[in-house]
Amino acid sequence: MLNTITDFLGKVDNFVWGLPLIILILATGVFLTVRLRGLQIIRFPLAIRYMFSSDEEDGSGEVSSFAALCTALSATIGTGNIVGVATAIVSGGPGALFWMWMAAIVGTATKYAECLLAVKYRVVEKDGHIIGGPFYYIENGMGKQFRWLAKIFAVFGIMVGLFGIGTFTQINGITSAVGNFFDADIVHYINLFGRDYSITIVISGIILTVFVALVLIGGLKRISNVAQVVVPFMAIVYVLVVLIILGLNITKIPAALIEIVEGAFGLRAFGGGMFGAMIVAMQKGIARGIFSNEAGLGSAPIAAAAAQSKEEVRQGLISMLGTFIDTIIICTMTGLSIVITGAWDMGLEGVAVTTKAFQMGLPFPDKVAAFILMICLVFFAFTTILGWDYYSEKCLEYIIGNKPKAITAYRWIYIACIFIGPYMTVQAVWTIADICNGLMAIPNLIALIALSGVVVSETNSFFERGVHKQLK
């Protein structure tokens, strides 16, 4: 029965993530990059200045621009950076990392465009509550006749929250890391649903479910406040630890980069296998890249819409940094540590791959290395769970309106999915996540192409008015 379900999910995943979606994702990013004249590269220094600027705009919104970025990062920096990269390299080879880079480079323009549109088309309700995201720029930008497309996006957004990035993958990654540290050999186990599970996985799953249930009482400002403190801290800690691995293995990095590029184009395969190997590397790399940085997925615009910014371009520039931080920095470092240590080719899966890379690359006892990774993963994944509850609630609100009782009921369903996550296989949770992500991205990418003229017009107006020169 389990094999039948796994096979079915695999077929659906291959269908959703076929060449059409891969082309759509890359083509949208390239199209926007060309129309914006490489803005993500040329205006990158300005984006950095805006991110650290204390000169906040007095615009309508619920949180600061930096807080909106941190809210988005709290949802994007999660298991995708640690476990997702590992699963991509194990499934698609080292070349998958190359395609993650390509998707991120053009995806930065995609992230800029979607967050700009989110601020432009956001709605202020009578009580002053700010709502926005792809559903609003689809409806208000493309026209009321496309409200059906906005609703499809919202439905898929709920699916990603309940079954993808928001719950299953995060809790599964956390409990697996806890299990690897406390009971790697599953000495203490309990039989549930016909399978043996480590007691530590069961207990940690229950504890984390309870913690999430308690935290979800808060709203956006609470999530933003927590994110501003936790996200930068955990990112710095993780980067420093991986830098140690790369520093101690610096002589192996050139060979690893060659292996990544060769793997990206199937150069180590022969004959017709070259094309097949390249497609698999592209599929896994881009899919995990979307999972990790969420560029084009349509989630970051929901957070960006709440920013206290009257200039859409300013928020777009700040928000696009999320893709750079997430993929170009954090995912790259994880991927390189996995490739240079050879952990990807040892028959392991999921968090065990990254754990092995840490144990092989750090000058610490194995238990210490596993503990460091476990702590990082707990922080990464926990904030992602909170961020995606917010995203998926906004999707639900778009469909049914602001109904507190329905939202409360949804939160209980969300919590129930978190409770279930630890007992699913690594392959199942990541396959389901990929399927949901692909479906959610399609309507958003269509909207970005349709509204690209608006993005270009707003961008040109911003720089022609010299607004960027007013930055102190």
What do these predicted ranges mean?
Residues T28, L32-T33, S74, A103-G128, ...:
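Helix-loop-helix module between adjacent transmembrane segments
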Residues G218, N225-Q228, F233-A305, K356:
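Membrane-embedded translocation segments of transport machinery
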Residues T4-I5, R35-Q40, G80-V85, G161-I174, ...:
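Transmembrane helix-loop junctions in multi-pass membrane proteins
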Residues L24-F31, L36-I48, I171-V178, I199-N249, ...:
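Membrane-interface loop-to-helix entry segments
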Residues T33, E114-R122, K126, V242-E259, ...:
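Extracellular/periplasmic helix-exit of transmembrane alpha-helices
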Residues M1-T79, I89-A96, G107, F419, ...:
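N-terminal alpha-helical transmembrane segments of multi-pass membrane transport
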Residues D58-S91, L117-G141, I152-V155, M159, ...:
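Alpha-helical membrane segments and immediately flanking helix-loop junctions
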Residues G38-S65, T87-I89, G93-L97, W101, ...:
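Flexible loop linkers connecting adjacent transmembrane helices
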